[in-house]
Amino acid sequence: MSDAICHLITDNGSYRPEATLSLRSLAERLGDRVGQKIEAVSLLHSTKISPDKLGGTPAEIFEPFIKKKREEGIHRFHVTPMFFGPSAAILEYMPQRVEALRPKWPELEVRIAPCVVDADDSDDTRMAQILVDQILETRNARSFKSPAVALVDHGAPRIKVTEVRNHLARQVRQLLSESEFPQVTACSMERRDGDDYAFNEPLLEKVIGIEGFCNEVIVSMLFASPGRHAGPGGDVAKICEEAAEDHPQLQWQMTELVAGHDGIIDILAERFQQGLHSDPVGWTGEIPEWQAP
């Protein structure tokens, strides 16, 4: 069996070319940092994008990609997730697909690095500092005096992911001056119906326009890359535009997205190294040692 390791950075995937191009940029920048070739591979969806919109190179998704690599004699894969928190996509879907492949591919070895944010490590404020940098840049660009901050994520079916959002909001609140930013609130873009998913509340549409969030508002985007939800014309922007129609005094601005900040590479590079020393998914018996690059 080949000892070669294929390194991937993975997101959930999107039908929008901007998301794949952003993931490719992250892969290149992370590869430069760690001295390895990093492949940009989404979990799902992205192969629906026309290659013409991706510089002629088709997008890759996880299962077909690793099967293709098998034909090249590659059986070892190391995944760095571009997920802020412990999403089911990484903790459940990907391991399930690996286990489903293993009966006919016993050599398959997949190690998954930790997600971007460890909510149990209160001393690590790097992700919060990225958000703060982008909030300050937005405040200065718009010449806001004392804006409120709505820190918004997509919304998730797993409470552990929402706890990451809330953890970051607490850190951002501590890092910002209260006199300059009187309100910092965590919210979600959307949620599933039912009481089981009420932990996603409040929704952005219920925050923007209420007292304290009806004048100057910065929408801090806990999104990695542009797509259907984030970026110009996305769902978050539409929610804000609709709120502005009902509240003429509302001045709002979204921050830039996380993937564009150099600080995310510092975090991903650390997670990359941690992933090299993680246990392979579903591995039984003696765990093979990988050499760090």
At which residue positions do the language-model features occur?
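Extended amphipathic ligand-handling, pore-lining, and cofactor/metal-binding catalytic surfaces
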Residues: 1-293
